Each structure stands twice: as C-alpha cells, then as structure tokens.
Amino acid sequence: MTENIHKHRILILDFGSQYTQLVARRVRELGVYCELWAWDVTEAQIRDFNPSGIILSGGPESTTEENSPRAPQYVFEAGVPVFGVCYGMQTMAMQLGGHVEGSNEREFGYAQVEVLTDSALVRGIEDSLTADGKPLLDVWMSHGDKVTAIPSDFVAVASTESCPFAIMANEEKRFYGVQFHPEVTHTRQGMRMLERFVRDICQCEALWTPAKIIDDAVARIREQVGDDKVILGLSGGVDSSVTAMLLHRAIGKNLTCVFVDNGLLRLNEAEQVMDMFGDHFGLNIVHVPAEERFLSALAGENDPEAKRKIIGRVFVEVFDEEALKLEDVKWLAQGTIYPDVIESAASATGKAHVIKSHHNVGGLPKEMKMGLVEPLKELFKDEVRKIGLELGLPYDMLYRHPFPGPGLGVRVLGEVKKEYCDLLRRADAIFIEELRKADLYDKVSQAFTVFLPVRSVGVMGDGRKYDWVVSLRAVETIDFMTAHWAHLPYDFLGRVSNRIINEVNGISRVVYDISGKPPATIEWE
C-alpha cells in the first residue's frame, strides 16, 4: 500500500488574482497537496474535498460592490482554519461583520507592517525591529479597498501607516487575514507565514514530495490500466517525457511511445530523443519520420494561425495511423498538467474549477475507443521537473527553455521550407551553445533564433553575397505574461553573430530583437 499523499490537503478558493496559482505552488513547495477551485463552490463540494484548511485568494474586484464575489458561508462554519489574502481578507471581514471601504489612495508596492500583538501566524517572524522593539515585516501590497472595522471577535495583529488592519486574527477559530501578498517573493517572510498556517495551524504533514508523488502515480496508473496496453505521443518535451518515464515505471513494455519527427525540431533533437528513451532508458518507442509530409502540407502557407492548425492536423493524422497499427491498445496517455486543467475550466466557465479530465486529444479516429491516462494532471510545471529529476531524466533536458508546440513552424516567418528550417536549426544551435558557454543560458528565461524571409547583402572575402537574415531573441520573465528583452553583453552578441555568419552558409545578417512584452509577444508568430 502506498501512503495517502492527499490525506492532508488545502483548498484555495480563487477570486481572480494574478497570483492565485502562485499561492498553490507555494503550498505544494511546503510538501502539502492543495487544489484551486472557483470561489462559488457548494457546501457539498467543500465537505467532499474535506480540507485541512482553506485559503481565500486575492482578486481584482471591490468587496464594496453589490455583486462582488463572496466566499461560501460554509467556509466559516467548517471548523477548519481559514487564511484570507488581500481580497480574501476583505470578504472575510465583511461576511463576519466587519466593514470595508474604498481607499483614497491605492497601496501598491513595498510596505512595512508593524506587528502590534502576538499571533500564531507571525510569532517569531520579523524582518527588523522598531526603536521600541516591535517586529516589522517587509511586505508587498496591492490593493485599493481596505478593512476599516474588523469583526468583533477578531484582533488587529499588525498595521501600516495607511492601513490600520494589515493583519487580523481570530485565534480561537483559527481565522487569519492579511492585506498583503505572502505568496510573492517581495514579501520576504511570506513563505514562513504560509508555512506557519499550513504546517502548524492546519497541522498538515509534508507528504507531497517527489518520491512519494512518483509512488502514488505508479500505483494509480497500475490500478487504472491493469494489464492493458497504453499509447503515448512522445515529443521530447518535459511533460510528455516525464509522462513516458512514469508509465514505463508502472507498466513497462505495455507502453508504446510514438515519436513523430515532423522536421520542425531543433538540431539533432530526433536522434537525442531516440537515443535517450529508446537506447538509454529502454522504452518501447516507434520513430515516425514525417518531415516531407508536414512540409508539403505547409507549402505555400504564410498565415501563422493556419500553419499551427496544419501542423496540429497532420500530427493527429500521423499519430492516428500509427495507433491503428498497434493491436489491443486500450488507453491514450497525455502529458496534461494542472495549469492546463485550470485553464480549460476557466475558458469554459470563466473561472477555475475542480480537477476534471482535460480532453485535448484532437481527432482520434471514431473506431478507437480509448480511455485517457493523465498522470501529471495534478502537478504544476516545477513539480513535473522535480519528478523528472527523481526519475533520472537529465537536468539540461528538464530545464530547457520553452519550445512551441508547432516548433520551427512558427519560428520560420511566413512559408516554411526545408532550406529555411535547416539554416535556422544551425543558427539557433550556435546561439544556445554560446549562451551555455558564457553561463548565460540559465540567466535568461527563454532564448531562440527566428528566420526572417528577407535577403540582405553581405560581403564574404572578395565577393558579395545576398543571403538570409536571422533575429536572435532572449527575454527575462517570471510568468511569461510580461517580459523584458535580455540585455546580453555586446561582445557576446558580436561573437554569436560572427559564428553564425561564418559557419552557416546562407545567412548574411544577424539582428537582435529588443522588444518587450507588451507590446510585442515573446514568439514572433
């Protein structure tokens, strides 16, 4: 019997903050399972989930508006600790008899919170002390409204100059509210506060660890599929690779991986995937060379969205044909991760919901009635990587920069041709190799090369050449929602440019993209 790693669990109710997924990731980092649900869940759903504690997230609305979101009243009757963050604190205060008002000044950015009285939430936690010995906390504020009167059975634990109730608490009921964001790194002791709430106040054990997650996933896969055969589309990306390794550990040769080589991958990537998963790890893997098929389908197409659809359609066609060749396959495995589940629920309903199967299968043939196996669907990306390391996958592969699903199909601008892909592959490999050599690869969030269908005059020796242009792109970002262009050293950029122009016959000019997001997107197409 594997240990029940879901035994202690935190429920996070999402009021729409951009930081809500970060709250969930922080709780997971503390070794405790949690789920993210929409704020309007029913009492029955909460009872069924049986949380050890509940966190109410921040949100963009104003609690003073008539129809603004409210926590289900049962949250405060369930007999478990509750932690309100920003909007979550405000709705807690209002629903329990306090008062919230719109503030004249919006408080955004760093603030110092002075701790006024003892509380289990912040006992022994401080960044500095006032002249008379009171603890101070450096926190990150982002709010317009503020609590102006707390419920009668609460106490004011901490304040700022403009916010009289920066922390409030009812120690007996174990209800806590903070007007700042403990989940962001700018709140220096935020992780300790979350740990205090989750581990001490809610008394959750650290059961959610990579090794235990693997044991649990393997047991669940075996229970779900038994002795049946499973098929997986393996791309060589993080999610499908970790899915393959988990399934291989659980069911061995009953897993068949199909690797579709679409001709739009990075330099030597197909060989690396086959070497690692076939030769090194011994997975049962079918290599399908399909470059000509993809490129002929893309011929003459310039529109980025149309290119994406063509690549997706042809992949499904090729994968289906291979699946039909295999006998007795009952299950399709997918590398769906928790943010996919949250996003698909949000796109359907406008908000996060309970974990459900995330059917992104596309167009499996009608005659193939397969069940779906999604061993990563409870996991965030950082957890998937940690599990991959535990399963023996190489660090460089797991922590590689993001690569788009359509691959070079959206990094060759306009029509995709084999000549362009070959040039781009070689130029990009030089850029990435130099980033690694200069110890810059892990200092940027994403770096890649784009092929521009533009010819430019160059000089090589005594002759002129009229060849293609590529653009280098490197960005720094935390969440990929916004990004700054990376200020790479000029001598480094010069070295990369010289190598590409000298070593890749067919490229005469290299430019560097200095656009932020917004207004530009990270990828060009």
Swiss-Prot record:
Catalytic reaction equation(s): XMP + L-glutamine + ATP + H2O = GMP + L-glutamate + AMP + diphosphate + 2 H(+)
Read off the Gene3D superfamilies from this record: 3.30.300.10, 3.40.50.880, HUPs
GO CC, alphabetical: cytosol
Q: Which Pfam families match?
A: GATase (PF00117), GMP_synt_C (PF00958), NAD_synthase (PF02540)
* GO molecular function annotation: ATP binding; GMP synthase activity
Which parts of the chain span the membrane according to its record?
A: none
Domain GMPS ATP-PPase residue range list = 208-400
Instruction: Tell me its EC number(s), please.
Output: 6.3.5.2
* Alphabetized UniProt keyword annotations: ATP-binding, Glutamine amidotransferase, GMP biosynthesis, Ligase, Nucleotide-binding, Purine biosynthesis
Q: Which residue numbers delimit the Glutamine amidotransferase type-1 domain?
A: 9-207
Coiled coil located at which positions?
A: none
The pathway where this protein functions is: Purine metabolism; GMP biosynthesis; GMP from XMP (L-Gln route): step 1/1
Annotated positions binding ATP: S235, G236, G237, V238, D239, S240, S241
Q: How would you classify this enzyme at the top EC level?
A: ligase
Q: Where is the active site?
A: C86 (nucleophile), H181, E183
**Cytoplasm keyword on record:** no
Which InterPro entries does this chain map to? Class_I_gatase-like (IPR029062), GATASE (IPR017926), GMP_synth_C (IPR001674), GMP_synth_GATase (IPR004739), GMP_synthase (IPR022955), GMPS_ATP_PPase_dom (IPR025777), NAD/GMP_synthase (IPR022310), Rossmann-like_a/b/a_fold (IPR014729)
What is the annotated quaternary arrangement, including any partners?
Homodimer.
| Function of the molecule | Catalyzes the synthesis of GMP from XMP.
Return the PANTHER family for the record: GMP SYNTHASE [GLUTAMINE-HYDROLYZING] (PTHR11922:SF2), GMP SYNTHASE-RELATED (PTHR11922)
Q: What is this protein called?
A: GMP synthase [glutamine-hydrolyzing]
